């Protein structure tokens, strides 16, 4: 532990006498931070880190600590640990790297993005020169060896996807792989108690085997459809952006996600926004079977042949004399069966039924029975004028017409609808089933959970 630097960093944090003082961490302290994920910016954290470092140095030799450090640091391109970095940048084992390639990796550590060999080869080359010169200055390298390394043409390896079965792009991993990585990373932390950094290191450098649920043939077909721009409208939307799309295909009986795609067109990077799992949108009328008609049937409020009045009820809501709710085509048929209301997606019928079901029962049904986790019970938002407004999805409009506060994901909507197919049983969607460690032991057994969401009678009516 460098007490002078540590104390100096602490004083600088309190007094702010320099903007570029640095963190004052030794390699041991940085290793502690990587292992614990303790990144709090405070004097207390620095002292806690220093004491942990002292304890670590009592039990391990310096070379062991350096090895652990090299196995945990980030090298960019989602590579944690020098072994994974060697695979990522050069598709080689660590022992196979040349001196120049080692210098390229060592140079990346200071700025994993800015010195990324794949993204910025020229910047990495400049940094590589600094590393080699420093090795000479420290007596670890001869000038002759440095000159030879400088002449070497260092090229990053590019994954063509030929050995991976990943058809989404020649360079980037698939949206499905992205989703699995995110889920396994989250589960390593929530189920096994790993810090984020420890989970990342284990995921990328720990030799894990992950059994996924993907069907390569189905995924390849989905990829081809989404990557063909002829399948999408050509112009910009009213907000100046291109219309987007995403898709999830799930086995309703097992919960296994067989394929997914997270956005229009070819994928443009690893771990980019996945609109199938990470984006929440108001579903509009697609919410009606989940929040209106299935609970209405289950609670005996309606039958498929029940008759309701297809007409606006309230002429004061909009303030322009037009009744509410209104159908999209502004046409009304008077006495109408539930079946017709569903077939034509009539807002008037949906509001009528939801009023009888009750908004709280509808909300509970969607969240507890059919797995919609992002519906909002109550949320305060500060408006532009400084006032605070409370939003809630436990209301007529959100639950009957899908204008939700946060929205829902395509993945959760897919799982909710699957209950109508699976005899009224809701099954949690899964992207992988097992994670094995490098010795073949099961780390995570991720089996889907199936619960009875509705009676078979309701299910039969809905189908």
What are these regions (language model features)?
Residues 98, 200, 216-251, 340-342, ...:
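Beta-lactamase-like hydrolase cores
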Residues 212-235, 247-249, 260, 266-279, ...:
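A penicillin-recognizing enzyme superfamily signal
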Residues 2-5, 80-82, 142-145, 297-317, ...:
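Short, well-structured active-site flanking segments
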Residues 243-244, 268-290, 304-307, 398:
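Short active-site loop at a secondary-structure junction
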Residues 154, 161-169, 374-440:
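Active-site-proximal helix/loop microenvironment
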Residues 19-216, 220, 384-388, 398-402, ...:
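Non-catalytic, structured segments within soluble enzyme domains
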Residues 1, 135, 222, 255, ...:
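Active-site SXXK
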Residues 13-41, 162-169, 302-362, 396-399, ...:
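Conserved catalytic neighborhood of penicillin-recognizing serine enzymes
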